[in-house]
């Protein structure tokens, strides 16, 4: 008797599913949906002007539209210091954090092998200035023994200013005393610290400042400079970088490229249009400073440099590793910067 073959619908469904799975696996990553929002974290001052340009000129949105990503929402969130910025990135409240080289290295070290935070790009360089209204203080050693004097930094122990102060202490008194002045430091927003210095009569008598607050302090006649970060490191160094988590980068390759390209374009625009950039800063931040003063700051590369190239960052990494602030010693700056930066002649 002839054997009658039976149909197997279950097998057909399974085969179809397998074909779909193979097809899905072969789809390029760019074909998969990317996020429709980019959230930036920033802090205070002229160091963050490239972000203001990117947001004001809608550079990310324009690039995303050309890349076929549709409408992208771009938001900017302000924080008082590197510790708060890092926490916002870790908690998923922002996608990109703009912070000092110190906070970048702390987060790179903390997330290495897990979340893998690295820098998307460098934004800017400036000499951080330790200013004081205390006439007793002319040099670093004059701080020793003062019981009525506090030094304001954006984040105690974490901010780039806090790290530079430790570097200065090590340079002056040796490795065992790198933390000698840490008990004098307090966390404070730049505008609040400047207000304290200019008002006088408060416990905060020194401020490790950035532009424009350092300019306000020194031109007021009420404060003088003790040292700069360029003095401590022996030359210019990058100050602020933009960093993010590996997962966001891998999940949004086209949008990541748009963000990076936007910052490239913003820095090119600033350097080619410094007066217009100063005007944008004043309008965007609602600054009460005179436009002519902002133009002076933006126009002087010795005081305010906008550059994608990492400079002097390994000096921070080696120092922070030597005092135990980070556990992992990077072999080079490329360890904590994403590969899109690796063609830069960095350091």
Question: Language-model segments: which ranges?
Answer:
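Bacterial N-terminal signal peptides that target proteins for export
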Residues: 2-17
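Solvent-exposed, polar/charged alpha-helical surfaces in well-ordered, non-transmembrane soluble domains
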Residues: 49, 53, 83, 87, ...
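Soluble non-cytosolic domains of exported or imported proteins
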Residues: 79-83, 98, 155-163, 191, ...
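Conserved C-terminal helix/tail region of periplasmic/extracytoplasmic solute-binding proteins
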Residues: 318-347
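C-terminal segment of classical bacterial N-terminal signal peptides
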Residues: 8-9, 22-31
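Pocket-lining segment of extracytoplasmic ligand-binding domains
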Residues: 191-283
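Short, glycine-/small- and polar/acidic-enriched structural segments
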Residues: 34-187, 201, 205-211, 235-236
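Secondary-structure end/capping motifs
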Residues: 249-327
